Amino acid sequence: MPKYVFGPVPSRRLGRSLGIDLIPPKTCTLECRYCQLNTTTELLCQPREFGSTEEILKELNTTLDDIAKPDWITLSGAGEPTLSRSIGEVIRRVKQLHLAPVCVITNGTLLHLPEVRKALFPADRVIPTLCTVFPETFQKIHRPAPGVDLCNLLKGLSLFASHFQGVLEVEIFVIPGINDTPREVAGLSRYLAALPRLAAVYLNTAVRPPSDPTIRAATAQELDNMKNGLALVVPVTTVLDHQPTSKRVIRKHQATPEGVLALLLRHPCTIEQLSQVLDTPVTSLEP
């Protein structure tokens, strides 16, 4: 089974996104109640060495030889990518291939570390998550590792935004009744309005089953209410404004069962999305 590279996956915002997962599954700084990938097995608060950059690049090149050019190469997966000390080197090496722009999807909890901010600067796009500006709500939603706190996240994100030259888009995961109250929305609005170089805000919600069954998806009306309540100058869109790309992934060879499993472990898909990813008819995937 591929150890690092998965997809391409049909992304709502990134089209055909080829993923690179730098760390072992479910290694994270948070144990978010809304996570679609079950519970975190190892909670960490500092970056570590996990994998060989050469091994990652070798696996990436093998995958790229088999597929048409992806729209994005995205560092994400089943945990927090900035926990990998090699993330900066991987970004630089991938960009040297000149195949696709590089995006990093992060929970933002390590952006207070200068070495993490510096590592992400070469990326073309960074999408950090920010669900609240209140510590008690942060604890309730994210259940962080010891040593991870909201104050560092807020300071780190502001510092990163002040110097990052790429596209910065903040994602808010909306949990009805928890972070969409007037107080919560007003707090997020104040912080985001002051965030330098912010390009856009994206409101997500539980479109796939979360690890905590008490978390429900926000309705279209609830998402619109939060969108209007933020009252930001930058564009604010919701998960319902975007549809997964309809572009098929053209492959030279049939995807292996191991490759499919590697994808599903990191990015749960519908059968229609799998059909696109595998370049095979839906009927051949039905039981």
Ranges and model annotations:
Residues 1-13, 57-58, 65, 183-287:
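Auxiliary Fe-S-binding modules of radical SAM enzymes
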Residues 12-55:
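Canonical Radical SAM [4Fe-4S] cluster-binding loop centered on the CxxxCxxC motif
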Residues 74-80, 107-108:
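Glycine-rich beta-strand-to-loop/alpha-helix junction loops that act as flexible
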Residues 83-226:
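Conserved AdoMet/S-adenosylmethionine-binding subsite of the radical SAM
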